[in-house]
Amino acid sequence: MVVQGTVKPHASFNSREDAETLRKAMKGIGTDEKSITHILATRSNAQRQQIKTDYTTLFGKHLEDELKSELSGNYEAAALALLRKPDEFLAEQLHAAMKGLGTDENALIDILCTQSNAQIHAIKAAFKLLYKEDLEKEIISETSGNFQRLLVSMLQGGRKEDEPVNAAHAAEDAAAIYQAGEGQIGTDESRFNAVLATRSYPQLHQIFHEYSKISNKTILQAIENEFSGDIKNGLLAIVKSVENRFAYFAERLHHAMKGLGTSDKTLIRILVSRSEIDLANIKETFQAMYGKSLYEFIADDCSGDYKDLLLQITGH
C-alpha cells in the first residue's frame, strides 16, 4: 500500500512570485482570500518556509503578522498552522492544550500517542526552543496518575522501532498484560504501559493477536473494560494507531464533526499535521468507514474561506 499525503511540492514553484502574489492579496482595501488559500494549500511545508523567508526579504515584514492582521477566526488559525514547521506546529498545539484553565487531554493523546521516536524528539526540541520550557515537566505539572505516567513514557521516544517480530516474546507479553488486567481483581496499569510504550508496531500486532488467543476479548475490549477516563483513551489511541493509523485519524475527524458543533482545533490539527504524511489514506478510510466522504463532511460542517482552505488541504 502506498502511504501518501494530499499536499505535495508544487512542480513549478517560484517562492518570490508566491510572496508577491500574497502581498498583492493583502494590499489595499479588502483581501483576496482565494489567492491566499490557493498558495497555502497547494505548496509543501518546505516551500511555505521558503515563501516566508522571501516575503520578509522582499517586504521587510513577516508573512504571519500580515496574515494575522488580514484574516480572522478559524480561517486565520488554519492559515497560520500551514505556515508553521510540522514539529513547531505540534509543539504549539501541545502548549495550547495545557495553558490556561483546564487541559485538552484529547490533544495530548492525539499528538503524543501516535508519533514515531524521531517525531517525539523533534517536537520536544521545538517546544524547548519556542517556550524555553521542558515539555516533560509541563506535562507532569498538567496531568496526574496513570495518564501522566503513560504520557511521560511516550515522551521518552524509546519505542524499539526496528525490533523484529518474536512470537514467543509476544506470547509472554500477552500473558503478562492479561494477568495485569482481566486475570486479576484490579488492574496493574504499569504493565500495560511498559508493553504499549516500548514494543515495535509489528511486535504489538503480534501481542494483540496472542492476547485474543488467551482471552475471549480483543485487547481493545479489555482496555475498555479495565480502564476509564484519560488513561483508557490514551491506551486505546496507541492500540488503534497500531492496528490501523488511518482508521484512528478518520475516527477522530468524524468525532470532531458529528453531532452539534465542530471541534475546529481537532480538525485543523489533524488535517494540517497529516497533510503530507497519510491524509490521502485517511480520506479513503473515512469514506469506507462512514459511507460519506471527508469532503462532504467538511462541506456540511464548515463555511466560507475556512471551508475552502480545508477542502484544498484534503486535495479538492
Curated annotation (Swiss-Prot):
Gene3D superfamilies: Annexin. Phosphorylated in vitro on serine(s) and threonine(s) by PKC. Annexin repeats lie at residues 13-84, 85-156, 168-240, 244-315. It holds the Pfam family Annexin. Keywords: Annexin, Calcium, Calcium/phospholipid-binding, Phosphoprotein, Repeat. InterPro entries: Annexin, Annexin_repeat, Annexin_repeat_CS, Annexin_sf. The modification Phosphothreonine is found at residue 6. GO terms for cellular component: cytoplasm; nucleus; plasma membrane; vesicle membrane. GO terms for molecular function: calcium ion binding; calcium-dependent phospholipid binding; phosphatidylserine binding. Signal peptide: none annotated. Coiled coil: none annotated. A pair of annexin repeats may form one binding site for calcium and phospholipid. Belongs to the annexin family. Homohexamer. This is Annexin-B12. It comes from Hydra vulgaris (Hydra).
